[in-house]
Structures are given as structure tokens and as C-alpha cells.
Amino acid sequence: VNNQVTTDEVNSSAFEIDLLSFQLTIGSPIVVQIKHKEGCKPKVLNPEVVKPSASYTITSIASDADGKLTWKTTGESGTLPYIVEQYRWNKWVKVGEVQGKGTAGEHAYTFKVTPHSGKNKVRIKQVDNAGAKTSQDVPFTAKVAQVNYALDPAGKTITFTNTTSQPTETMYEVFDKFGNMMARGYSAKVDVSKLAVGTYYLNYDKSNAEIIIPKRK
């Protein structure tokens, strides 16, 4: 264990290693090496005990109108990423990650979310072997104009504009009728020239729309 030989009795078909005797601190690195004979590969029955756990406690979390999300935590137990999610299009969408510090002290984190128009909701979570541990929802109202879309008559380009008809960048997703994602990104235009004729579903800003790619000349 961390290059130290255990004093536990290991010359048997089943044995237990007592990690308490190594005086490890929560969140510190650990490497367990088991030397064995050829054809006698060991099986670890509870590997989760040396893996990071989502044990954090949030002491504060908030977002400003520009989407700057800040939070503080204590009680982390091992390095796990904080997954940042935003509620868009009637679902939670992953928008990024921040690597956790993994130790028990207080830690501060920041992530810039790209807001959509109007009221927003964001949250963070960590995922370990037991599942996901999710924070409360964090609401904020963004200073972002509503976005409109237009598909050109040739069915080759989707353009996003603001309320003054100026091109504006926004997050988007395009799905076919079977639910397969055909395009995803953040832009003022989407090239759909390679999509086959048919019906598609567009998610953009905070809205949804059905688009029809026409037969091209």
C-alpha cells in the first residue's frame, strides 16, 4: 500500500487489508499493489472503498445575471469532477466540468454558464459508484435577448437572430425524427445542407421548433 508492505496475513485464498494501519488522510492518493503467482489473479471484492466518493457539502452556491456560477464546498473525499448542468429544452444539459480538489477543507469554484434568454436554472453534481449527488437548483434571470430562427428557402442554413434581426450566437441541437442527434453547437448559423429531405427538430436558446428540409434543386 503506497509502497509499504502490509502486515496482514495474505498467504491464503481470501484475505483483508486493513487500511487504517497506514494512517491515510481522506482524499490522499493510494496505490494498492498485489503480487501473485501466474494463473492466480486476485479479485478485489470492494474496490469502491479506495475510490473517490461524492461526499461534498455545499456551503454556498449562486449565479449572477451573466451566468457566472460560484460555489463553496467542504467535506470532499477524493478527486471527482463537478458536472455543471443547465436546464434547457425541458431537460438538464451538461455544459461543463470543474475538477474537484478532493480534500476535506473549504474550496471555492467558478464556472461560466452560457445563459439563454429569460429565467435560467443551473446545478452541479458529482457521480461516484453509488450514483449522483446533485445540488439544489440555482435560478437566475439573464440579460439576454430572445432568439429567433429562420431556415433559408433552399434548406441549407439555419440562421439565429435577436429581436433587432441581428445575427446572434446561441446553443442549439438538431435531431432527426428518430431522436438521433444530427448537429450540436454554439453559433449564429447551422449548416444543414447535408441533411436528407424530411422533418427535424431544433432546440435553440430556450425554445423548440420543427423544421422541414425541402427537396433541393
Where are these regions (language model features)?
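Generic short beta-strand
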Residues: V84, I124, M171-Y172, Y200
